[in-house]
Amino acid sequence: MPTISSRGSSGAGPKHDAVDGAPMTTHRFEVVHRAGDAAALHEFEPPATPTPTVVVAEATGAALVLGSTQPASDADPERARLGGYEIVRRRSGGGSVWLAPGGQVWVDIWIPAGDPLWHDDVAKAAAPIGEAWRQALVDLDLGVGLWVHEGGVEARPWSTLVCFAGVGPGEVLDADGRKWVGISQRRTREWIRLQTMVHRVWDPVAATDGLGVVPDEWLSQAVGMIGDADPVPGLIASL
């Protein structure tokens, strides 16, 4: 039976390193596009130089990504095998995240030590990133009453199982409590990596298939979707 690992998969094929596109510089951020499987994209690989960097990540295969503290027993490798997707683990966040090619916009923001956006406080480091995301979505007329959560982690229904069901520092919600932008962090003395994501399509059935549970109406309505909109240019401009 397939096993769950920090870099492995449910056995659905060979693993490949992420492939980087040609970097460019916009404003003061270097922008890099990467494509690869979920495990490769989650590897902690800081930029070669201490330059603020935006990495736009494109998942090439479907995966259920467990959070750093989530029990392996939450996931069912056999269901993943039958569904043709991976089960991997990231080293940040709480609940699981569902990834599918084209199903989300995933942007990692790397902040080097000493940068104006660096802050030792996790919530204060996430807040300006969330505000940049909020502004990018507002500029595209997405969501109603979008706001940035500046407090700590808050539990909600399903949040121990599904990351986008909970609320954490810097995350963007709308007036009805739907979460639009998820943010998690990993830190060293040299870098903060803020992993951010919005869903183009929220599929609660796919997101919970590998967990062996059936989504209810609350979870089905808990996440905002951006469709075909392109928020990345606006996000970078707002950072």
Predicted regions located by residue number:
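Active-site loop/lid in soluble adenylation, ligation, and acyl-transfer enzymes
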Residues: 2, 19-82, 86-90, 96, ...
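Residue-identity detector for glycine
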Residues: 8-13, 21
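Cationic, low-complexity basic patches in intrinsically disordered or flexible, solvent-exposed regions
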Residues: 16
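A glycine-rich, hydrophobic loop/mini-helix early in the fold
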Residues: 77-121
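Short histidine-centered catalytic/ligand-binding loop motif
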Residues: 109-126, 219-229
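Long, positively charged amphipathic alpha-helical accessory segments at protein N-termini or as interdomain linkers
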Residues: 130-158, 186-239
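Aromatic/basic-lined ligand-recognition segments
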Residues: 162-173, 177-185
